[in-house]
């Protein structure tokens, strides 16, 4: 089994903090629709090209899909017709068993799998939400970021705080039962009390999943340039701890399981229809992101679209981060990607950076004797400092370890 990621690079405007590859479409409608049509045709053809390549490569036959994720960019910028074509192609290539019920205007898959699409709140109109019913999408990930209109304007977000709440109501009316919302903290001049207010407004929405991150100043972004120019100031370490502690404690009190450094899933609710990737704990939320969990637990995945990454059979590949060049290459039946072989040390380092982010941590039994000895030798002083803990063959971060997780991971890596 493997995950399928499809990158939709289009954004109506660029947020000042975003380091992901994205493009702002042409202002003229005809030009914009032409680029969308060519890009959608290209990602559909890339799926076909990759399937053909895999079927012709000895030992590289891959199994069915366990998750599908449409990310970006802003996938909700696509037309309904484009989204429908993408899913029809997925079904043709990967045989997920789409079942279209035209009478009730719904679509499902023969075997339940998690299918997520990222959306902006202002894209979720009544019509858009109802159109989702006729697609197999069963999970929406929505970027709220903050419930302060002032901070939304600072980020160059196009929506308002009220539109987030309206969008969730529209999704509920369309029978979308699995909604995730992204929230940020650590804005310039943001206080702890303001952060608490954001958390309470989010909890009032009664959603199934929350991703919460500190505001990052990524090199190359407009936000980073503001920081370098001294026009904004990053939050200090003490305020970060207070905000993060508040987040963890309040979400736990509200019935959310923290299963990764930045991700929280509601514990109560329906039984999961999807296979949980890790089974260390008997009690797990049915609303964990199965797609993201596959990254953290070393499950192979295919990335489709400009800048998308793939991992399978000991290889990692990535497509060119240029929409025009990507479209041209695919139209010429070429896969515009580079790849590298993942050696044992790289695989070990990848595991440190991914599995250690999860609440379960690293399953030591999956390591060879050599790497297990190496890891535990480096982990010992960190355990003594209270940053790491071993439980029944799993090595994981403590809460104090989470605060300095980047440093801990760096100390454990093989160089």
Task: Locate predicted features.
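Local cysteine-cluster metal-coordination motifs and their immediate loop/turn environment
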Residues: 9-22
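Minor-groove-contacting beta-hairpin "wing" of winged helix-turn-helix DNA-binding domains
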Residues: 394-398
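Short amphipathic alpha-helical interaction segments
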Residues: 370-384
């Amino acid at each position: 089994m493997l995950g399928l990621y499809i990158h939709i690079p289009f954004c109506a405007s660029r947020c000042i903090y975003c380091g992901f590859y994205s493009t702002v479409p042409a202002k003229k409608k005809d030009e914009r629709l032409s680029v969308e049509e060519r890009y959608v045709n290209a990602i559909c053809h890339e799926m076909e090209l990759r399937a053909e390549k895999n079927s012709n490569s000895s030992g590289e036959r891959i199994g069915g899909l366990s998750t599908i994720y449409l990310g970006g960019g802003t996938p909700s910028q696509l037309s309904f017709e484009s989204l429908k074509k993408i899913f029809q192609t997925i079904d043709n290539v990967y045989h997920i068993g789409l079942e279209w019920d035209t009478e009730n205007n719904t679509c499902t898959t023969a075997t339940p799998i998690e299918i997520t699409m990222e959306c902006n709140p202002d894209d979720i109109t009544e019509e858009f939400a109802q159109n989702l019913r006729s697609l197999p999408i069963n999970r929406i990930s929505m970027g709220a970021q903050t419930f302060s209109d002032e901070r939304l304007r600072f980020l160059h977000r196009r929506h308002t705080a009220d539109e987030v709440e309206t969008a969730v109501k529209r999704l509920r009316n369309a029978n979308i039962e699995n909604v995730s919302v992204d929230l940020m903290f650590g804005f310039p001049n943001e206080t702890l009390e303001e952060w608490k207010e954001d958390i309470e407004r989010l909890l009032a929405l009664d959603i199934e999943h929350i991703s919460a991150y500190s505001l990052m100043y990524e090199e190359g972004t407009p936000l980073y340039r503001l920081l370098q120019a001294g026009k904004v100031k990053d939050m200090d370490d003490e305020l970060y701890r207070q905000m993060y502690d508040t987040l963890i404690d309040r979400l736990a009190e509200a019935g959310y399981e923290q299963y990764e450094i930045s991700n929280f899933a509601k514990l109560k609710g329906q039984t999961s229809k999807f296979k949980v990737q890790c089974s260390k704990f008997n009690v797990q939320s049915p609303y964990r992101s199965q797609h993201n969990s596959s990254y953290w637990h070393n499950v192979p995945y295919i990335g489709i679209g400009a800048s998308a990454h793939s991992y399978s059979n000991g290889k990692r590949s990535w497509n060119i981060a240029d929409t025009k060049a990507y479209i041209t290459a695919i139209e010429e039946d070429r896969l515009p990607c580079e790849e590298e072989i993942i050696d044992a040390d790289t695989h070990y380092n990848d595991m440190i950076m991914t599995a250690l982010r999860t609440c379960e941590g690293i399953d030591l039994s999956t390591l060879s004797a050599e790497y297990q000895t190496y890891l535990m030798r480096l982990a010992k002083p960190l355990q003594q400092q209270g940053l790491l803990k071993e439980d029944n063959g799993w090595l994981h971060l403590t809460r104090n370890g989470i605060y300095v997780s980047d440093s801990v991971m760096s100390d454990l890596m093989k160089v």
